[in-house]
């Protein structure tokens, strides 16, 4: 059995993770911790893998503390910048087990979203234009989503590798309606009551358009991906920092 601790256990995502861990046949809940709990309770004696699902303002400190405890970490919290990732890599290198420490960060755990992102990177080289639209519930604290940023980076890298020119755009005045530009790709965020987590990637050429869309209607859609990451970290996942569930899928 894989002993799993959950940080953020009372949150919207964390509570679903606790339920999923309890239901799975090969995992057991070790500790369920929340905002006021001491993370140094999590040790290699009681935990094989810890799942961290909190908010961007505290996630980095949580992950650094857990690395210091020597436990492997699955991170579902979004809002990761290059600067934060550099701190994680440094913590691993200077932690108690630099050669074997595993940290996994997922922009999205939904299989549909991971596949949509993968398909988008494959399609990007064939289209002159590309834009990303992400749509979420109004209680989400970051915008654009980590998934959308990850998708935009992937599209930009694929376009660069193919030698494509910048996306055409004759806009001269923009009060913000064109969205955030991520590596030359416009990313738009919608926050609307009734939504959960959705993403559309639009590709265009003269006379044609390709739309790739992923919809997660309920948070249970993320649980297979979370459990996959837990099993991989408890098994044959490489040491160090890994970003993206696509690394654990046969794509």
UniProtKB/Swiss-Prot annotation:
Q: Which domain of life is it from?
A: Bacteria
> Which is an annotated Pfam family here?
DapB_C
Q: Where in the cell is it found?
A: Cytoplasm
* Pathway where it operates: Amino-acid biosynthesis; L-lysine biosynthesis via DAP pathway; (S)-tetrahydrodipicolinate from L-aspartate: step 4/4
Q: Which organism is it from?
A: Bifidobacterium longum subsp. infantis (strain ATCC 15697 / DSM 20088 / JCM 1222 / NCTC 11817 / S12)
GO terms, biological process? diaminopimelate biosynthetic process; lysine biosynthetic process via diaminopimelate
Q: What is this protein called in UniProt?
A: 4-hydroxy-tetrahydrodipicolinate reductase
User: What does the protein in this record do?
Assistant: Catalyzes the conversion of 4-hydroxy-tetrahydrodipicolinate (HTPA) to tetrahydrodipicolinate.
The gene name reads dapB
The record's EC number reads 1.17.1.8
Q: Which UniProt keywords apply?
A: Amino-acid biosynthesis, Cytoplasm, Diaminopimelate biosynthesis, Lysine biosynthesis, NAD, NADP, Oxidoreductase
Q: Which PANTHER family match?
A: 4-HYDROXY-TETRAHYDRODIPICOLINATE REDUCTASE 1, CHLOROPLASTIC-RELATED, DIHYDRODIPICOLINATE REDUCTASE
């Amino acid at each position: 059995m894989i002993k799993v601790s959950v940080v953020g256990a009372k949150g919207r995502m964390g509570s679903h993770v606790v339920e999923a861990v309890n239901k799975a046949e090969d995992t057991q809940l070790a500790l369920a911790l929340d905002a006021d709990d001491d993370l140094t309770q999590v040790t290699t004696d009681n935990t094989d893998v810890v799942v961290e699902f909190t908010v961007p303002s505290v996630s980095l400190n949580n992950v650094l503390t857990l690395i210091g405890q020597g436990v492997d970490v699955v991170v579902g919290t979004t809002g990761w910048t290059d600067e934060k990732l550099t701190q994680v890599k440094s913590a691993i290198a200077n932690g108690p087990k630099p050669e074997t420490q595993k940290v996994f960060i997922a922009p999205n755990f939904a299989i549909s979203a991971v596949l949509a992102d993968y398909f988008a990177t494959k399609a990007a080289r064939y289209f002159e234009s590309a834009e990303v639209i992400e749509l979420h519930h109004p209680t989400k604290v970051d915008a654009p989503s980590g998934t959308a940023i990850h998708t935009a980076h992937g599209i930009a890298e694929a376009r660069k590798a193919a030698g494509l020119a910048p996306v055409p755009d004759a806009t001269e005045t923009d009060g913000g309606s064109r969205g955030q530009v991520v590596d030359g790709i416009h990313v738009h965020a919608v926050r609307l009551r009734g939504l959960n987590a959705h993403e559309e990637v639009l590709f265009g050429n003269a006379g044609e358009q390709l739309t790739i869309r992923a919809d997660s209607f309920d948070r249970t859609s993320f649980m297979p991906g979370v459990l996959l990451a837990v099993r991989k970290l408890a098994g044959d996942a490489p040491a160090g920092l890994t970003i993206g569930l696509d690394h654990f899928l046969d794509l």
